[in-house]
A protein has these predicted regions:
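Compositionally biased terminal segments of proteins
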Residues: 1-168
Length: 168
């Protein structure tokens, strides 16, 4: 998925009134201000209350199919268009205390909404993205791939974050 595709999806969501936050590899590239590698999908964080306009926006883009990947959950699943467009969707609930809840009722996580209020750019277009700290944390919750090693090293270097042991 190239930058034009990512921006087309984000622009469509914005026109629909959906407040989307870029996550994953695109978040790191947005924080770095440049695309550093190819991406197979666009991770997007969206409040569950925006699901209806999000679905309408996705259908207009042809993002109307589920992409089973083995870890599908009601709050995290992948949709695609049968071609190059693929979105890894992360739905959360806004809490009254300024945090968000991500996950199920029994096994979810609450975290500060500020983690989803980072600022970055994709092709010089300003986008909301994960904060540097949160992007780093999200990349350490699973066995790292080769691209994750490069992403994390670049992120830590730019924002002077300590490099996690698994990435040394």
């Amino acid at each position: 998925m190239d930058a034009d595709d990512a921006l087309r999806i984000l622009s469509s969501l914005q026109r629909a009134g959906v407040e989307a936050t870029v996550g994953g590899g695109w978040a790191i590239d947005a924080l770095l201000g440049e695309q550093t590698r190819p991406h197979s999908d666009l991770d997007v964080w969206v409040a569950a209350e925006d699901l209806e306009p999000l679905i309408k926006s996705f259908v207009d883009l042809g993002l109307d199919r589920l992409f089973p990947w083995g870890n599908d959950r009601p709050w995290n699943f992948v949709v695609h268009d049968g071609g190059a467009l693929r979105v890894d969707l992360h739905l959360y609930e806004k809490l009254s205390d300024g945090r968000v809840h991500y996950g199920g009722v029994r096994h979810g996580d609450d975290f500060d909404f500020a983690f989803l209020r980072g600022h970055g750019t994709i092709r010089e277009m300003p986008v909301a993205c994960e904060s540097p700290d949160w992007a780093l944390l999200c990349h350490t919750g699973y066995p790292p791939r080769a691209v994750d090693h490069e992403d994390v090293k670049r992120l830590c270097a730019k924002f002077r974050l300590p490099l996690p042991d698994a990435f040394r």
